[in-house]
């Protein structure tokens, strides 16, 4: 079942490049002929407008966390990437059906048998592990509260095989073995809304777990649960989004955090020292990290409640450009994504707006290339993946009403 696709253009935007302001108006289509169009819209609509957990895309399927309001229609739904048709559904019990019923899912082969699993934290206070093709439950991993963030599958702890790492909403860290055994836990005693990450942050050839919390503190855990550092990232706002990458020439990675007060903060992965701090506006959000302009130095791409998207130098936090993609007053803005949307070997920036718009930008300049919209809010970032092996990434966006839209971008040669 498909809804009619709509392609729109942005009525007005402002680009600020190194202090220069450029205004432009767009009417009746993009002058470059590029188009962002919907190939399907899923039949997973709900009566509430509060869905805000992103989908996962892997192996020909989209896994959509669908929330509602205690009417029994909360679910994790598997659908085909080609047509959005439902393949299987896991229903959350009505008493657990809330706007946080199912958090962002993860797809991974946990046990190495060549068959993927889907993992999702739920309001049943567990991480549910499903056989990806069939939707059958393989195991349930108990949490102390519901999970808000995406489970991580990584070779992390000093144990055989890969581990499952989950941080529930009240800040308890769980590390499970691939057999479901709890290896260790730790309590942060604060809410965690930003996505945790496992990587070798300090450059010692061993992975660590980085977690940011409501208090504005970030904590780096070693694989045995030992705290390696604890840093105050913000005294004025909660950490709600984060990303990471190699921003400079030292071996350690940098953690990049965005806060409700509007700060974007770069933190050294070895020591936890704050390397830079930039203010972009309230409810800052960050996810994309990469060399979007091809100059050999990475950028981080940030949004804020005022509807603007910013490119920041990842090493210094200096703002390289700013573009307004949403003109109307909105509640928040999801963070933008990087991906090769047209298959030409270079990346584009995709910004989902809380007003229901999805905008493609040139990551080097901030120029708006194309846009799509539904008259429904968006509360989370898109998921970008080349799901049909055509060398071009597709974007999957979940709207607040629970419908998932697959978007494709075409740009003339």
Show which residues each predicted segment covers.
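Hydrophobic alpha-helical segments
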Residues: 1-413
């Amino acid at each position: 079942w498909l809804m009619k696709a709509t392609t729109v253009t942005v009525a007005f935007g402002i680009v600020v490049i190194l202090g220069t302001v450029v205004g432009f108006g767009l009417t009746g289509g993009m002058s470059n002929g590029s188009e962002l169009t919907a190939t399907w819209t899923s039949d997973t609509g709900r009566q509430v407008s509060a869905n805000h957990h992103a989908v996962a895309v892997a192996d020909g399927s989209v896994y959509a966390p669908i929330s509602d309001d205690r009417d029994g229609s909360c679910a994790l739904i598997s659908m085909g990437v080609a047509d959005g048709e439902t393949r299987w559904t896991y229903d959350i019990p009505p008493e657990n059906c809330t706007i946080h019923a199912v958090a962002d899912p993860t797809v991974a082969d946990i046990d190495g048998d060549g068959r993927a699993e889907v993992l999702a934290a739920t309001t049943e206070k567990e991480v549910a592990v499903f056989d990806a093709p069939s939707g059958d439950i393989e195991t349930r991993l108990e949490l102390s509260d519901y999970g808000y963030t995406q489970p991580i599958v990584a070779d992390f702890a000093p144990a055989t095989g890969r581990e499952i790492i989950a941080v529930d909403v009240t800040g308890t860290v769980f590390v499970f073995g691939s057999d479901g055994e709890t290896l260790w836990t730790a309590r942060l005693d604060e809410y965690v809304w930003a996505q945790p990450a496992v990587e070798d942050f300090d450059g010692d050839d061993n992975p660590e777990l980085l977690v940011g919390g409501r208090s504005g503190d970030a904590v780096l855990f070693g694989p045995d649960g030992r705290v390696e550092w604890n840093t105050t990232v913000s005294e004025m706002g909660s950490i709600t989004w984060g990303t990471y990458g190699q921003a400079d020439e030292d071996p350690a990675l940098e953690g990049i955090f965005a806060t409700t007060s509007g700060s974007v903060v770069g933190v050294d992965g070895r020591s936890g020292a704050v390397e830079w701090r930039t203010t972009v506006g309230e409810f800052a959000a960050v996810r994309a990290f990469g060399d979007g302009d091809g100059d050999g130095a990475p950028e981080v791409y940030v949004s804020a409640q005022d509807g603007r998207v910013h490119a920041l130098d990842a090493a210094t936090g200096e703002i390289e450009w700013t573009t307004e993609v949403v003109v109307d007053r909105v509640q928040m803005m999801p963070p933008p994504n990087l991906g090769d949307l047209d298959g030409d070997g270079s990346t584009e920036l995709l910004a989902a707006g809380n007003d229901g718009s999805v905008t493609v930008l040139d990551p080097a300049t901030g120029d708006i290339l194309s846009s799509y919209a539904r008259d429904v809010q968006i509360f989370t970032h898109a998921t970008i993946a080349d799901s049909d092996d055509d060398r071009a990434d597709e974007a999957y966006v979940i709207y607040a009403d629970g419908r998932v839209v697959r978007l494709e971008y075409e740009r003339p040669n």
